[in-house]
Amino acid sequence: MSLYVQKFGGSSVANAEKMLHAAHIIKDTYEADNDVIVVLSAQGDTTDRLLSASREICEEPSLRELDALLSTGEQASVSLCAMALHTLGVPAVSLCAWQVPILTDGEHGGAEISAVGRERVEHELHERRVVLIAGFQGVNENGDVTTLGRGGSDLSAVALSAAFHADRCQIYTDVAGIYTTDPRICPKARRLERISYDDMLLLSQKGAQVLHDKSVALARRCGVMLEVRSCEEGSGGSFVDARGSGDALTGVTKKFCERSVLVGVTAVGQSLPSVEAERACIEALERQDITVYGVEEGEAYLTVFVHRDNADEALCTVHDVLFESRAAS
């Protein structure tokens, strides 16, 4: 019997139909004679709506009370998913982080996980129940709810995978894995079957939205292999591990610069930086009448800065010229 940790993001459980679809995925995993721990985010834009509601009451709410409020979105998700599983005949129990417990430091709004309790979850698994755990949250030494910041549910899933030595850590998103760039913007993006922790960490730090950089860093530190999948796809997906694919070029992403009209378009790969790649990018952008305002180089990456109005076009241009030149070489 294998242990699966499955995390579903907010867009994957945004409404009743999607929640039931996620429940069917969980059911299939459970009925294949596996133990299953599920981590859920708040549905859709629930967190944003809760945050907006708090601002209507108080411009600068207490961080403690804000954490208590925001954590209710995930609590609702796990309860609803447990109900969905019950209707499918699957025994399931929902837990908030304090019931596990997932212990954190005292930092509200961006807490760090310090330990994960095992006894309660192991008992539920022994009773052959699916254990649904609210993501994005923990509890500090005072018994107060804390939240883990952006990407917190990914962090919850990785921490639980490490604590329980899970055989699989599956991250379900609205895309069918990790791509060489955003497939919703660039038609020539292709899915990566495998990527290294180091390359994924760089892509996340430079703007890729699939996985938060803190969760990738924790997975690397704990040796947790990640599997990124889509709820809508029956196969495929991408693995993130220490080995990676060995490809010299991995992906291209973008990140808007704070307090600036510029956006950084970054290519990541072990062949970077290089004079040839920099020249190819600049020349391709110039052919599209896109001005390059600067270049930044670092270990395994190359960034060109363009005006944010050209962000999507520049992303596709840099992606296509680098991957086409690699294919031709």
Segments the model singles out, each with a brief description of its role:
Residues M1-V216, T303-N310, A328-S329:
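Nucleotide/pyrophosphate-binding catalytic subdomain
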Residues P91-V93, M225, T291:
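Conserved beta-strand segments of alpha/beta enzyme cores
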Residues F164, R221-V224, C257-V261:
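Short gly/pro-enriched beta-turn/loop segments at secondary-structure junctions
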Residues R168-Y172, L226-V228, G294:
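Short hydrophobic alpha-helical runs that function as membrane-insertion/retention elements
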Residues L201-D241:
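A conserved active-site cap/scaffold subdomain adjacent to cofactor or substrate pockets
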Residues S238-S329:
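A conserved regulatory-domain signal marking ACT and ACT-like small-molecule sensing domains
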